[in-house]
Amino acid sequence: MSISRREFLKANAAVAAATAVGVTLPVKMVEAAESDNIKWDKAPCRFCGVGCSVLVGTKAGKVVATKGDPESPVNRGLNCIKGYFLSKIMYGKDRLTTPLLRMKDGKYHKEGEFTPVSWDVAFDTMAAKWKHSIATKGPTSVGMFGSGQWTIWEGYAASKLHKAGFLTNNIDPNARHCMASAVVGFMRTFGIDEPMGCYDDLEAADHFVLWGANMAEMHPILWARLSDRRLSSKDCRVHVLSTFENRSFDLADNPMVFHPQSDLVILNYIANYIIQNKAVNTDFVTKHTKFALGVDDIGYGLRPDHPLEKKAKNPGNGKSTPISFDEYAKFVSTYTLEYAAKMSGVEPEKLETLAKAYADPKAKVMSLWTMGINQHVRGVWANNMLYNIHLLTGKIATPGNSPFSLTGQPSACGTAREVGTFAHRLPADMVVDNDKHRAITEKMWQVPEGTIPPKPGYHAVLQSRMLKDGKLNCYWTMCTNNMQAGPNINEEMYPGFRNPENFIVVSDPYPTVTAMAADLILPTAMWVEKEGAYGNAERRTHMWHQQVKAPEGAKSDLWQLVEFSKRFKVAEVWPAELIAKKPEYADKTLYEVLFANGVINKFPTTDCKGDLNDESEHFSFYVQKGIFEEYAAFGRGHGHDLAEFDRYHETRGLRWPVVNDKETLRRFVEGSDPYVKAGEGYNFYGKPDGKAVIFALPYEPAAEEPNSEYDLWMSTGRVLEHWHTGSMTARVPELYRAYPDAQIFMHPEDAKARGLQRGDEVLVASPRGEIKTRVETKGRNKPPRGVVFMPFFDARQLVNKLILDATDPLSKETDFKKCPVKVMKA
């Protein structure tokens, strides 16, 4: 057998990818565990949104090993390096086991020292603060910041407690920082959220196009499947677009490093190329799409008095007007190859190669994107533009033809999006500012008409501003570390946490940066210390049983939310006019109205087939099943169908809609989606007319650009070994040793021009602050001249405090990828 040099290099890239995934590292450890009297059970991985299934090995009440689940259709027995060390995330030396309240002279004090207290004292203190705030300032003075790492029932309980209990929509998940632009993109184009394709498309595509997605490190199991397809199919090609070279470039046939923000130009160029070269699928476009012109100059989601916001003509305006195909073609006609090459810095032949792949009617194309597209001040537009390309060519919802938005958290889809824990959303894609949607939800929740406020609550970035301004006073964060992960910490977030008017509660297993800035820390159960359910990026809902007990004193987020609701009588938090509609509720607790409501509490604990279920034992009913079934009723018959609860414990997950116990691989297409009738071909049924929208949207610049003082673009992101802020992975000795400290990746010539060498300590500064770190001029990430990259996992180097809190005005998602900085020797 002969092999070309190019194929040899590609094969080496695959080996490198497998090594990065961690396939070979812990084999001996796993083999040893097989014969050591360990009990194994399934669970989805605790980390990213891929949704790998792992087998969890327990012994003597402790998780002692994890390995890839060979029965999983997602990861097929593989784990990435983080997945292999899951068994250690719960056993950090500084695990919290008792509530900690800031106290001075025996009572709570904002400037006091953290002091151990009982759960009763913690909840009594919290409840008193909440009741006082609601009574004196109204329900909008309380709020919560949650997580795409919540289980489905935790997110549902949190949303219901706030929207129907405390009468506030001031609840938002950290998925606002990562997936909000994807959500709004789906809703604008299709009228319904989440991908139409599935992971099976990885085995069918001819071309893979990565848009701001370093899959080799951030989604390594999917990258392994993609690599296998590339190396086993001689005609398969990989195109990678990024603002700097990363490990995904190792497999790229068509690598492209573009200037920050110019992806918008490239996307419109491709649409123009398709039209100019008569590659439009005219039949598909005529039958299944329509065109619209979006509003431009929409601002940057900053405070209203910010100069950039005052300058915008249409701040936050997401409206559009119908146009014809010819008008759309004229709109994109100015986005020529020459203009795209000039704006992006990418060689014209590479751009044309990419455009030809999309335009070729015989080629199946899978577009994959994540934070590079979403964490973008025009992230919604970028999502819409990606769909434009697939809709113009009809390359959508068939095997290998898939515009696929990747998620970063294990249940950003299943909990944050599907459950509706955003400040503007309700379950099953309903929204709070729609009268009909509120009425449906109020009926399902058995609360009076008018219970749910019609105005969206404070989104993530706005929560920080309102804390600082003293308008949001009681604030509970769960399952997230926003003081490290969020933007503009110095100017907005930290002042809000330490505002003397505010009482801040953080639920976390560990003393994170966020926890240490709070007034009360609540110790939390983790992962398989509780029963859970996640929903991954391909609409797969996957459940697990509790497999070990949490350390004594640590309680799950679900327990905390439901137990806290017992502290409130309806009459203490609802106005008289609302109680008058349901006077029988006046003397009841929120717990009785929201959770012991005859629906959630109707399933006995004997229904639970797992060995443990501490929450259900405490509440004396199968609380997880009850919440799930109440929640699932929202989507059944409405395109979001979930299977019966018990089915998920029997499987490695099912992809919704699940109709007649059959999952759906691809949506909107006849023969796969049960909501598409025979003879329709396609039906984008999220829209009343069944047609998807192709948007005419322009290029607009970033909120900030480098200047004479801050002369470098900086992007922040992740690395393979750590997940998000490292609050779990940095406590795993093997992962910490593999990557102990963050560095700033620079081009060698940029370092030389500043008198710097690899390993030098430097100051990195933006208009909002500065940090110390060390220079890396080699290694896995290779920025071009003028660009630097720094990961945000290191709690000792809070790089995101340099980031401006500019957001996409439509999705309110922060742009973490484009910040002007200067780098100097420390």
UniProtKB/Swiss-Prot annotation:
Predicted to be exported by the Tat system. The position of the signal peptide cleavage has not been experimentally proven. Residues 1-32 form the signal peptide. Its cofactor is [4Fe-4S] cluster; Mo-bis(molybdopterin guanine dinucleotide). GO terms for cellular component: membrane; nitrate reductase complex; periplasmic space. It is found in: Periplasm. Mo-bis(molybdopterin guanine dinucleotide) binds at residues 82, 149, 174, 178, 211-218, 261-263, 371, 375, 481, 507-508, 530, 557, 716-725, 800, 817. Keywords: 4Fe-4S, Electron transport, Iron, Iron-sulfur, Metal-binding, Molybdenum, Nitrate assimilation, Oxidoreductase, Periplasm, Signal, Transport. Residues 38-94 form the 4Fe-4S Mo/W bis-MGD-type domain. Its main location: periplasm. [4Fe-4S] cluster binds at C45, C48, C52, C80. GO terms for molecular function: 4 iron, 4 sulfur cluster binding; electron transfer activity; iron ion binding; molybdenum ion binding; molybdopterin cofactor binding; nitrate reductase (cytochrome) activity; nitrate reductase activity. SMART domains: Molybdop_Fe4S4. GO terms for biological process: cellular respiration; Mo-molybdopterin cofactor biosynthetic process; nitrate assimilation. Pfam families: Molybdop_Fe4S4 (PF04879), Molybdopterin (PF00384), Molydop_binding (PF01568), TAT_signal (PF10518). Catalytic subunit of the periplasmic nitrate reductase complex NapAB. Receives electrons from NapB and catalyzes the reduction of nitrate to nitrite. NCBIfam families: NAPA, PRK13532.1, TAT_signal_seq. HAMAP family: Nitrate_reduct_NapA. Belongs to the prokaryotic molybdopterin-containing oxidoreductase family. NasA/NapA/NarB subfamily. Component of the periplasmic nitrate reductase NapAB complex composed of NapA and NapB. This is Periplasmic nitrate reductase.
